[in-house]
Amino acid sequence: MKIRPLVAEDLPQLQQIYAHHVLHGTGSWEWEPPSLAEMTDRAQAVQKKGLPYLVAEVAEQIAGYAYASPYRPRAGYRFTLEDSIYLHPEFSKQGIGLLLLQELMLQCGSLGYREMIAVIGDSANHASIRLHERAGFVEVGVFRNIGFKFGRFLDSVYMQAQLNAPASTPSN
């Protein structure tokens, strides 16, 4: 398995992985999978910001992907990112997610970001919560019943981790 930056040729496989999670899971609260063109636009938006967009590759197949995006658009949040991570169902529970998340955190820390937020759709998503705990995240709050998918209301779990970034306080 190798972790590397996303290239355009990866996007069809990423779109299929994400579509699976949209249609069968609560990790994303979208109801309809985005098109390949939309996935391409989203990935390019992350890359244009200079943020990592990583894929895990096993035998030339994409096993999963992870990327960081700004937590909020306002300037006061500029040192905080949100992670997103999705695995191909055939590659879950093999440690790939943890390796992807750890590499994402390392790269974001080296870029000077201080904090990473995980917004986990559904408090019953124990696998994602455990994954983030293993990577050093701690739960900081739960918003109850704020989402709706598959005929039920869903909680959103917020987790936070400090990144490997300098401890100095930046000037405005």
Identify the role of each PLM range.
Residues 108-120:
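Conserved GNAT acetyl-CoA-binding A-motif
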Residues 15, 19-43:
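Conserved GNAT-fold acetyl-CoA-binding loop/helix
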Residues 67, 119-120, 133, 138-155:
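Conserved catalytic-core motifs of GNAT/GCN5-like acyltransferases
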Residues 8, 33-90, 101-102, 107, ...:
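Acetyl-CoA-dependent GNAT
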Residues 2-16:
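A short beta-loop-alpha structural element at the N-terminal edge
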Residues 93-108, 126, 130-134:
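Conserved acetyl-CoA-binding loop-helix of GNAT-fold acetyltransferases
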Residues 1, 61-65, 154:
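Glycine-rich phosphate/pyrophosphate-binding loop shared by adenosine-nucleotide-utilizing enzymes
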Residues 79-81, 145-172:
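C-terminal "cap" of GNAT-fold acetyltransferases
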